Amino acid sequence: MTLQSDLPATVRPLGPVMLDVAGFALTEEERERLLDPLVGGVILFARNFRDSEQLQALTAEIHALRSPALIIAVDHEGGRVQRFRTDGFTRIPSMRCLGRLWERDHVAALESARCAGYVLAAELLAHGVDLSFTPVLDLDYGCSRVVGDRAFHRDPLVVAALAQSLVSGMADAGMGCVGKHFPGHGYAEADSHVEIPVDEREFDAIWTEDIAPYRHRLGRQLAGVMPAHVIYPRVDPNPAGFSRFWLQDILRGRVGFGGVIFSDDLTMEGATVVGDILARARAAFGAGCDVVLVCNRPDLAVDLLDRWAPDIAPESRARIEALRSRPQAADPFALELHPVYRQARDVVAGLVEDTA
């Protein structure tokens, strides 16, 4: 397939690869890499944040590279997975805090989740970030070393209710969301960043419990879904993110999900069973992922961009384009003038104090 490399450098459709960058500003090498037709987005990390002004400059620089602008994303869940924590950003509690509040007061928990979603999204948008990879929809079985307090609750209906409130708050601010890690990472003990997790359960248990939040009406509000680098050997021999059964038959077919499917980071240990970086990208794409993430290994990113020539379906490009956010505040100073934001921030601040 022709990747339209003959187009002017600043005008080209969004591609299926999301990369990271090293520091507070782009290097010349990174600018060139982000102009590659295969690239469609950038994921930021804590190392990319010094202060509010610097982050705004970085996102503006990334957005100015191309038209349509590259999508800028971040893992900004709250709790221990919150990349930006100071100077323009409110500390968001872990999702387990909201689950514990649910045990005491359902109404307060739902309102707190909505406020957390609004604050999280509004602050990111005010700094030029388009998308957060949240909420975590994994169930808190108490055994996963990587999920833990990132999960709302053990009960899938509680997870769905709290996540829907969080997602509604994000939508009110103008941001879509990405549920993860389909079909569920909570039962697998190993951390897929450094190991290859295995979940030995049968399909019916996973469908009834872990997939329930995706089958809930919440699933229709998700802009994206990220599958787990977990193997469910009694269902399919491939990790979920490389499995047509999980992504096409179940997520697209039985669940009816129509948004973007993002791979988890292809450099994680849980992805290595598939082969080298090209094999991983091909497998994820072939299974049904629209966007593949390659993080923390610029050498592998360069290798993939040099060797991969995917056939990108128009409907996949359309799904990616639909992720475009609609920020309501131009910058953090303007955000402070919004009474809805200030009220929501007060609720979130009080929740952190109550559960610290």
From Swiss-Prot:
Biological source species: Aromatoleum aromaticum (strain DSM 19018 / LMG 30748 / EbN1) (Azoarcus sp. (strain EbN1))
Pfam families linked: Glyco_hydro_3
GO biological process: carbohydrate metabolic process; cell division; cell wall organization; peptidoglycan biosynthetic process; peptidoglycan turnover; regulation of cell shape
Superkingdom of source: Bacteria
Site keyed Important for catalytic activity: positions: D191
Role summary: Plays a role in peptidoglycan recycling by cleaving the terminal beta-1,4-linked N-acetylglucosamine (GlcNAc) from peptide-linked peptidoglycan fragments, giving rise to free GlcNAc, anhydro-N-acetylmuramic acid and anhydro-N-acetylmuramic acid-linked peptides.
Record protein name field: Beta-hexosaminidase
GO CC aspect terms: cytoplasm
Location of this chain's protein in the cell: Cytoplasm
Keyword NAD in record: no
Gene that specifies this protein: nagZ
Xref: PANTHER family: BETA-HEXOSAMINIDASE, BETA-HEXOSAMINIDASE-RELATED
NCBIfam families: PRK05337.1
Chain segments annotated as coiled-coil in the UniProt record: none
Catalyzed reactions per annotation: Hydrolysis of terminal non-reducing N-acetyl-D-hexosamine residues in N-acetyl-beta-D-hexosaminides
